[in-house]
Amino acid sequence: MATSAAAHGDHAQDHGHDEHAHPTGWRRYVYSTNHKDIGTMYLIFAVIAGVIGAAMSIAIRAELMYPGVQIFHETHTYNVFVTSHGLIMIFFMVMPAMIGGFGNWFVPLMIGAPDMAFPRMNNISFWLLPASFGLLLMSTFVEGEPGANGVGAGWTMYVPLSSSGHPGPAVDFAILSLHLAGASSILGAINFITTIFNMRAPGMTLHKMPLFVWSILVTVFLLLLSLPVLAGAITMLLTDRNFGTTFFAPDGGGDPVLFQHLFWFFGHPEVYILILPGFGMISQIVSTFSRKPVFGYLGMAYAMVAIGGIGFVVWAHHMYTVGMSSATQAYFVAATMVIAVPTGVKIFSWIATMWGGSIEFRAPMIWAVGFIFLFTVGGVTGVVLANAGVDRVLQETYYVVAHFHYVLSLGAVFAIFAGWYYWFPKMTGYMYNETLAKAHFWVTFIGVNLVFFPQHFLGLSGMPRRYVDYPDAFAGWNLVSSVGSYISGFGVLIFLYCVIDAFAKKVPAGDNPWGAGATTLEWTLPSPPPFHQFEVLPRVQ
């Protein structure tokens, strides 16, 4: 193959056109139209943003380690860290890693496509993100609250705290940052939908697609339908702040609760956007290391479709405390609990996939099993919070923080690490150190559980969220939680060392290091795959 490619290159030079030439050096990445290079840039970006977001969370836990103000003597800065940590982890870590990174890398490979449908649009989808991230970081250095820098309104940006409460320009920077991140995701969503519907290899019907591709398809539909609503909401906030409109200002006939409705109509689909690609990755990994096909493939695919659909009609369960009618609350309680059904289908299908399988506990598999266990814990506390009467007491306490961190910090992040170790040999051609990867898992597992399990107790005791200080009664579990965050931080260092170690030792991985269980198309290609794959489309039986 190399010979024919070289001969073709000589021939093309004679004619002054070489379809196979691609830019090298920095141009290869800055001008990239290659889904693998763009996916790699997304993953590197996600790691950088993730380290920054994790550093902020460790600063938050360092502050809360003891009662009294420890390090945030300008107490507004504590809320800036809370806000930035949330926005960074959601928009610049989880989404770029799962959708931009693994999605770009493996959707074309898994459906037998040569690339994405719109390669140049793919490029700007990525490059909008560093600009967006830059704007968010800039917001922390300009005035927000009077006499203090940065946005301290929480990632939810509730008015009036984000309007009259932040007269400085910081919130405007954050709004423009979110606009760019949203534009990036909408363009990416259009690209994925077009690619998955139009570029599948012959024989690759929708019902033969790998579940990871299904998960990305559902996810990008959620993005396409929910992000424009967020864009509308934050544009209205921008005009309320700068151009005299009163969408959310009661003195002009507006309603601050309208902002919450618009925000959460985006925000609830968003949390499913964060977890659905993880579901897809876990399905591939559990199947691979159990050496058998996923149990209930069609049920798994349509469970994700159902989760995506119902996810759009439950948004006000974030708003039980704003004074909705009992009938409205009753509807949102019931609708929210219905989501537990397709989610349960997925949990039990993963367990059924492992049942009777020839299981091999390599690093990706232990991350996946950890995901299933911890995501289930997070799901159970979610069913608790779905009850409006219970939520009245637990709303804005650490019980809510514990709930969503169990599905995100111990759910989505575990899925990302599972996917990282699963596909790292395919992306790089190098094998990681199994011992380091397992050490990374166990240190992280112990750390994150120490951080977030005690927060359920704090919430049940009534400790509210987003406060820099707290009564002495809450000191014990906060100390445990903060120690856990340092352990988790050490886990991140093990991860970074594991990556450096793999690139230093360069142990060749082979085309398929996982054996007979790995049945999707990417394992038929070399590791790493060629710059252009599937120039002759594969045929799927």
From Swiss-Prot:
Crosslink feature (1'-histidyl-3'-tyrosine (His-Tyr)) location: H268-Y272
Positions bound to heme a3: H403
Region (Disordered): 1-21
Record's compositionally biased regions (Basic and acidic residues): 8-21
One BP annotation, GO: electron transport coupled proton transport
Membrane topology: Multi-pass membrane protein
Cross-referenced SUPFAM superfamilies: Cytochrome c oxidase subunit I-like (SSF81442)
GO molecular function ontology, one term from the record: cytochrome-c oxidase activity
Task performed by this protein: Cytochrome c oxidase is the component of the respiratory chain that catalyzes the reduction of oxygen to water. Subunits 1-3 form the functional core of the enzyme complex. CO I is the catalytic subunit of the enzyme. Electrons originating in cytochrome c are transferred via the copper A center of subunit 2 and heme A of subunit 1 to the bimetallic center formed by heme A3 and copper B.
Family affiliation: Belongs to the heme-copper respiratory oxidase family.
Protein's name according to its UniProt entry: Cytochrome c oxidase subunit 1
Species of origin: Bradyrhizobium diazoefficiens (strain JCM 10833 / BCRC 13528 / IAM 13628 / NBRC 14792 / USDA 110)
